[in-house]
Structure formats: C-alpha cells, structure tokens
C-alpha cells in the first residue's frame, strides 16, 4: 500500500509562528514580495535570510496534510509531499499521475521523454508540472488553511466520479493469514443439578496475491449431549475488476434478491456495485431539460438543495445525482440569464429492484445444494439479471434449474411513480414429484414503498405474495422430493396434498416521526405480517406498535405486540422502558465517573406474568472497561415469583475483549459466564492481535508504527502493540479509507512523522500502512551563541550523523528529538546569503526538569565556527 503521510508538525509550527511575526495574510500571493527586516527584533535581525519566503507560500520540503480542491470543489483530505525545486525558494507540491486519478482529473497524454517535470522523487516518482502539461491549469497552496487548490479546464475533470477511486489504485494488499475467534463458557446450577457448556466459533483464512482463502467453524460442548464440531463456508474468492464482479469457488450462498437464498458448493460470479461510482451504484433518475440561455439548474429534495450546475443553451442531461434519500420527489428549477425561472417535478421513489438507467446487476451460481434436512443434495444452476430501462422502469428476471426435476423462472418490473415505488414479479415453478406427477404453479408478488413528504410518513414496505396451489419454492420442493423418496417409518407418506406450503403473505411497516412547528415529539411505528398455508389451512400473524421519545431528562419507549399461531392461540406482550443519565439525576451537565445511566424495563403478557428489570451501566474514561449491575423481579402465574441480581464487566485488552457475568436468583440458582473475542493476523512482521473480531468478508489493515505502543487506530479500540504493529477491520473496499493514529495515549517518547494514511483495499484484502516514527529522547534546549548574538529563527539543528533533529524557535529555544545521553549538535543558517554554523555540546542530567516526556536542557552554548 502506498502511504500518504500527514502533518509535519515542526514545519507547520515554524511557518505559523513566522507568519504571525510578519503579519502575513491568510492566502499568500504567488508574486515576489520583499519583507521588511524592521519587523523582526534582535541584534542580528537584519542579517536573517528571508528569501525563502519571498515567493508565494513559505512552504519548505516536507509532508503536509492538506484539503485538496479541484475547481473550488472539495475532493479529498490527503497528505501531499512538497519537494525542493532547483531555482525555486519554496517547495512545490509533488502531484503524480496517481494523484490525478485520486483527484478525478484526466491524465494528460505524456511519456517520460516529453513529460514536463517539477522533480523526480525516489518514492513518489515523477512530480508533474501541471501548469505546463495542462493548459490554463494552476496549483496554489494556502499554508494557514492547509488547502491545495488545483484549477483545470472543466473538460479535464472526470464526470460522474465523485468519491470514486480508479481501479488502477485498488490494492491487493499483502500476503497474510488471519483468524477471528469467539469463545464462551457458561456454568449454571440449581439445587441438585449443574449444567455447563462451551462454545467456540472461528473465522480463518489466508491471502495470496488477489486470492482469498476462507473457512469458518464452530465447536459446541454441553454436559448432557457431549461435543460436536461443524466446519463450513470453505471457499476461495477474488474480484475481477474488468467485470466489476466477485468470483467465489467453494461453499457460498446464492443471492436472496430474486429467489430464496440457499447454500451451495460450487461457483458464484456476481456484479459488485461497490466497484461502481457512487452515482451509478444507487438509483436516481436522469434529469432531461432545455435551457434557453446560459442557465443555472438547481435540484432540491425535501426542501434541501442537492445539486446545482450551469448549462449552456440547448438540451441538457444531468446523470450524476446523489439524492439524500428515497421517497421525496425532485424539484428541478431552471433559472435563465434574464432571471426568469421554470420548475418541474421528477418523481423519485425506489424499491430494492430499481437501478439507474443503463445500469445492470447480475448474479450467476452453480453447484451442489447443501441442505442439512435432506439426504439427496441435487445440483443447482441459478441466474438473475436486473437492468435500468429508464427513469421509471427497471426490469429483472431469474431462473433456477436442478438435476432432480425442479425449474423456476421469474419476470418482474420495478416502477418509479409520483405515488411511490412499486415492484411486481411472477415466478413460475415446475416440479416432478417421485411416484406422482408434475406440478406447475405461480407465485405473484407486489410491493410498494412511499414517503409521504407532507407528514414524513414512511411506508417502508407493503408487500403481498400469493402462490397458487401447485406452486413450490426451491426449499419446499427439495424437502418434499426428499421426504417422498425417503419416507420415515410410522409417519404418513408425504405428498403434494398434505405438504404445508405458503398460500398468502402480507407484510406492512410504517414509520411516523411526530413533529409540529419544528418541535420533535418522538416517533411512532406500526408493523405487521400475516400468512396462511395450503393443505393445512393454518395461518399465522404478528402485529406490533411502538412509540419512543427523548426529553431533557432522558428517553423512553413503549411497545405492544400480539401474535397468533397455527392453532389460533394468542400471545400478547407490552414493554415499557426508561433510560435516565445519572448526571441528569445529580443535576450536573458533565459526565460523571463510574455509572452513567439507569435503565428500567417493565413487561407483561397479560396472563399474570410480569417482569421488572433495573440496571445501571458505565464505562471507564478511556472506554476500555465497561460494566453494569442489574436486578429484577418476575411474577409468574404458574410458579413461584422470582427475583435476581447480577453483574457484567468487559475489558478491551490488546489481545481481545474479555467479558464476564454472574447472577443469582431467589430460587437458589446461579449462573456464571466468561467470554472472549478477537483475532490476529500473521504477516511478514510477525503475529499481531486485534481486540476486535472480524468476519470472513471483512477487509483489514495491518498498521506499523515502531515505538508508538498504545496509539489507537482510527480512534477505536485497536491499538499499536509493543512490537509496533496493530490491526483494524473498519475498512470499506474500493473506497478511500483514512487510517489514522490517535497519539494521545502514546506510552513512549516517540514522534510520528505522519498520523494518517490513505488506503483503497480490494474486498477481503489486508493492506499494510507503514507510519514512519522517530524514536529517542526528546528535549527542549535553550541555546545561546558564543558571540552573544541571537541564533536566527528557523535555523536547522543537526546531530553528529548529519540528521536534522529540530529547528531553532524564538529566543534561542529549540525542540529536538533523538539525542543521546551526551553529544554534540551543530546549527546552520544563512546570513547575508552566506552559510554560518556553530557547534554545541550537551549532556543530560538525571535531575533535569521535564515537560511531559521531554527533558529541559538549559545553558547550551553554541561556538561559532
């Protein structure tokens, strides 16, 4: 992985201080300027060489964390190396061809022979002179705002590529092996009986180049039933960039978008929308319009502006929208040059099937079905395809074929309208039942999704499915075929006539925020489902309703649920919960140490069974330790009432999360549990543990920062260990990920040359982020010249090996790093364009005063050479 280094602290401090002395403007002009030495104080002020600050920004060679803007549009926060250029007083930004891709600027047609270069860096390669290669281009750097502005003609800017990373920048990562684990031990006892169990789950794998080998398993042991082990999900995987797809060989699951998902052992090849530009990965309509003059086009959604551009006279197309949400129509306003305005509305609602016009999504699977409850596992071929036809229609289709006489085909449409988004599809199945006949049937499905903007009511899903009497889905068909071929003794033989299968199914979900005159009164939800079945005539249903709100003293929620089973029995329940921060009870506005909140839950089933639970939880200042205590009382209609008390604690160690709980009940029963989860990565630098577990599909980063033990990665729980490595799993494939180190918890006296890096990993990769550090004792030196004059501000300080270890600040005070117990330093600067240097000796004292981990060395005398 190519690391993008960040802040050069000493350089930035030097520049900021010097700007204050010179009363610099926020933005530096590119024109030559001459500074008046009378602004500087000191005997030797007139001899200080200020020429390096006469040409634009006073940038010196180094690595700076900058905000990159292209044509005044923010692109990325990234580290840029500034290199020294012959004939230039100030360093210039080293912009490479790779940077142009990152900034979504088309690469100029150049080669090594005719490239116009600022410089050539051994690590970065060619530093391009954009002002020569791209006509009318300019590059400006604002030191105070740490902003790098690149202006190029609009024709050079890639279209529809906001937040997109070119495939040439996707990283395979390093070769590595990894293992994630979750272990849990449980012990319970009641008078006269003990029960114990152990559970362990593992996700492991290995990365070799672009290939990922993965497997998972779990182990169970119980006092009564003994032990068993299950090893599954064994596969190799890689992406295929040219197809924007993923390839899996081995055990995987078919997609559940078109048909019900099943486990297979074979091959799966499917398109991956994460590889597409964000403007193509999600649904949004293409806007067509006509401008009479040079016009400004503004698009709003829900009252918020989401897009604005300027178009020339004539027809225009806007195909790079990134709406803020679904369900609210788009309002398009065309403002002509004379001030006249025209407005029209573009319907915008979406269901999961909707795609942008011209965008396709596909999935192909083939292999042996893996189903635990059948004896004969057939081979399956399944394929599906979705395609955005226009702003209003997305078509999709799919097929399933097995080698035991089952086929199914599907056709469907997704529709975007002003009254919401609809989808409709029909599936036709054909199955041959052994010793019976061939059955054909259909299943019809309709769904609706709508946001009612006036009331903010979200009807997330209202779906209805009807299946004819002879329709069978794949899972039902395989189960029935297997039960007919392998009947169980003493049971009625299975057939299509007595096999229970779904007939109707309805699901509804409504969410309603309650707001009035900009005041929030909480939110309300309602959801329900109902289904019935062929053959058995049974039906099931479930309904729930709830309300939640937050107030100045805390939050609360109430919900109720009712369900009916196949026999018509009802099961009712009601829940009421309160959460009150302890600082509210104490009347303070700051977080208190110890416990942070009190939570209360009350529930009842209206059958004489009621429960009250009260708990309090908290966490340590560094969030590594969390804990809670709880107590409760249960009223049982059919048995004796029960009370309990318990506690829980967890610790985020460098090797994983350790947790334990204990509880005791009034019936003399006891429960104790211990658990841990985490993971580790084996790489060329050794074995590095992570205190976060990760799944087989997670993308990881191994971070190296020698000597930076204790630094948090991405401000989370993962830290750098004593060997200078750490692991984090919070990465998104095919997107720019900023890997940052929080240096507030550093345990050693070490300086990071950079505190963040940028990585663009492929799916499942392990990228390597190398943070350069400077280890060794740091010191604050108070230095004077042997001739009594002041050492010039910003003079460089060198150790005995010729390495720059610091710079002189105001009043001869300097911060240096990497000094020995005793030794010599040399200081160099320019006076009247002539080099001047002095030599000084230092020696550490055990009694020396310290600021943090830096010692203070006074009375350092520098002898003029």
Curated annotation (Swiss-Prot):
Disruption phenotype: Deletion of the operon under classical laboratory conditions does not result in any major effect on E.coli capacity to form biofilms compared with the wild-type strain. Induction: Repressed by H-NS. Induced by heat shock. The keyword Disulfide bond applies. GO terms for cellular component: cell outer membrane. PROSITE patterns: FIMBRIAL_USHER (PS01151). One of its GO terms (molecular function) is fimbrial usher porin activity. It comes from the Bacteria. Keywords: Cell outer membrane, Disulfide bond, Fimbrium biogenesis, Membrane, Signal, Stress response, Transmembrane, Transmembrane beta strand, Transport. Disulfide bonds join 838-862. Gene3D superfamilies: 2.60.40.2070, 2.60.40.3110, 3.10.20.410, Outer membrane usher protein FimD, plug domain. It holds the Pfam family PapC_C. The keyword Signal applies. GO terms for biological process: cell adhesion; pilus assembly. Its main location: membrane. Residues 1-29 form the signal peptide. InterPro entries: Fimb_usher, Fimbrial_membr_usher_CS, FimD_plug_dom, PapC-like_C, PapC-like_C_sf, PapC_N, PapC_N_sf. It is found in: Cell outer membrane. Part of the yadCKLM-htrE-yadVN fimbrial operon. Could contribute to adhesion to various surfaces in specific environmental niches. Probably involved in the export and assembly of fimbrial subunits across the outer membrane. Belongs to the fimbrial export usher family. The operon is cryptic under classical laboratory conditions, but is functional when constitutively expressed. This is Outer membrane usher protein HtrE.
């Amino acid at each position: 992985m190519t690391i993008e280094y960040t802040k050069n602290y000493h350089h930035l401090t030097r520049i900021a201080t010097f700007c204050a002395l010179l009363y610099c403007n926020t933005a530096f002009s590119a024109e030559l300027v001459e500074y008046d030495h009378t602004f500087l104080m000191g005997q030797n002020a007139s001899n200080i060489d200020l020429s390096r600050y006469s040409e634009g920004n006073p940038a010196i060679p180094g690595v700076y964390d900058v905000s990159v803007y292209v044509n005044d549009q923010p692109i990325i926060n990234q580290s840029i190396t500034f290199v020294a250029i012959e004939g230039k007083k100030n360093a210039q930004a080293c912009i490479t061809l790779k940077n142009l891709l990152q900034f979504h600027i088309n690469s100029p047609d150049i080669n090594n022979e005719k490239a116009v270069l600022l410089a050539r860096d051994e690590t970065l390669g060619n530093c391009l002179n954009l002002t020569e290669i791209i006509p009318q281009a300019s590059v400006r750097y604002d030191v105070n705002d740490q902003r790098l502005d690149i202006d190029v003609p609009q024709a050079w800017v890639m279209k529809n590529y906001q937040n997109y990373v070119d495939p040439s920048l996707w990283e395979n990562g390093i070769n590595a092996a990894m293992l994630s684990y979750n272990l849990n031990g449980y012990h319970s006892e009641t008078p006269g009986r003990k029960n114990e169990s152990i559970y362990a789950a593992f996700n492991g794998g290995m990365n070799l180049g672009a290939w990922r080998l993965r497997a998972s398993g779990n182990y169970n042991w119980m006092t009564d039933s003994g032990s068993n082990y299950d090893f599954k999900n064994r596969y190799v995987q890689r992406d295929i960039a040219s197809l924007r797809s993923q390839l899996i060989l081995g055990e995987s699951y078919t997609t559940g978008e078109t048909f019900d998902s099943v486990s297979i052992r074979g091959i799966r090849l499917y398109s991956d929308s994460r590889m597409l530009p964000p403007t193509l990965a999600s649904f949004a309509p293409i806007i067509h319009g006509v401008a009479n003059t040079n016009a400004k086009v503004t698009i709003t959604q829900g009252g918020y502006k989401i897009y604005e551009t300027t178009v020339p006279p004539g027809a225009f197309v806007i195909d790079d929208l990134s709406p803020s949400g679904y369900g609210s129509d788009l309002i398009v306003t065309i403002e002509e040059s004379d001030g006249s305005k025209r407005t029209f509305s573009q319907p915008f609602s979406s269901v999961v099937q909707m795609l942008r016009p011209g965008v396709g999504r596909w999935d192909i699977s083939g292999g042996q079905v893996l189903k635990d409850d059948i004896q004969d596992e057939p081979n399956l071929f399944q394929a599906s395809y979705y395609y955005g036809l226009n702003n209003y229609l997305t078509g999709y289709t799919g097929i399933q074929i097995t080698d035991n006489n089952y086929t199914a085909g599907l056709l469907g449409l997704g529709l975007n309208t002003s009254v919401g988004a609809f989808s409709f599809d029909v599936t036709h199945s054909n199955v041959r039942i052994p010793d019976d006949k061939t059955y054909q049937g259909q299943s019809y499905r309709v769904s609706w999704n709508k946001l009612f903007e006036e009331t903010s009511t979200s009807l997330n899903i209202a779906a209805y499915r009807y299946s004819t009497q002879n329709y069978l889905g794949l899972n039902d068909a395989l189960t029935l075929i297997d039960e007919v071929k392998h009947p169980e003794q003493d049971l009625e033989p299975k057939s299509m006539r007595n096999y229970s299968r779904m007939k109707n199914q309805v699901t509804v979900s409504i969410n309603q925020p309650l707001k009035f005159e900009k005041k929030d009164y909480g939110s309300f939800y309602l959801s329900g489902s109902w289904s019935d079945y062929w053959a058995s005539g049974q039906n099931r249903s479930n309904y729930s309703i709830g309300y939640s709100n937050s107030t100045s003293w805390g939050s609360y929620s109430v919900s109720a649920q009712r369900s009916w089973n196949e026999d018509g029995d009802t099961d009712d329940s009601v829940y009421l919960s309160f959460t009150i921060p302890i600082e509210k009870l104490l009347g303070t506005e700051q977080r208190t140490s110890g416990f942070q909140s009190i939570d209360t839950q009350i529930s009842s089933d209206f059958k004489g069974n009621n429960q009250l639970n009260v708990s309090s939880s908290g966490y340590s200042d560094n969030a590594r330790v969390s804990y809670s205590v709880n107590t409760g009382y249960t009223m049982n209609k059919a048995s004796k009432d029960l009370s309990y008390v318990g506690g829980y604690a967890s610790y985020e160690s460098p090797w994983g999360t350790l947790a334990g709980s204990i509880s005791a009940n009034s019936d003399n029963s006891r429960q104790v549990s211990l658990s841990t989860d985490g993971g580790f990565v084996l790489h060329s630098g050794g074995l590095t543990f992570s205190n976060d577990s990760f799944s087989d599909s997670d993308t990881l980063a191994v971070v190296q920062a020698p000597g930076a033990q204790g630094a948090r990665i991405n401000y989370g729980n993962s830290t750098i260990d004593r060997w200078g490595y750490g692991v984090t799993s919070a990465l998104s494939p095919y997107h720019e990920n900023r890997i940052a180190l929080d240096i507030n918890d550093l345990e050693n006296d070490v300086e990071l040359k950079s505190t963040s890096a940028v990585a663009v990993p492929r799916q499942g990769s392990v990228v390597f982020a190398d943070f350069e550090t400077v280890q060794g004792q740091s010191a604050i030196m108070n230095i004077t010249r042997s001739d009594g004059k002041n050492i010039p501000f910003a003079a460089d300080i060198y150790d005995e090996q010729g390495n720059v270890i610091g710079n002189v600040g105001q009043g001869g005070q300097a911060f240096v790093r990497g000094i020995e117990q005793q030794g010599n330093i040399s200081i160099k600067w320019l006076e009247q364009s002539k080099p001047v240097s002095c030599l000084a000796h230092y020696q550490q004292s055990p009694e020396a005063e310290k600021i943090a981990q830096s010692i203070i060395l006074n009375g350092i005398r520098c002898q003029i050479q």
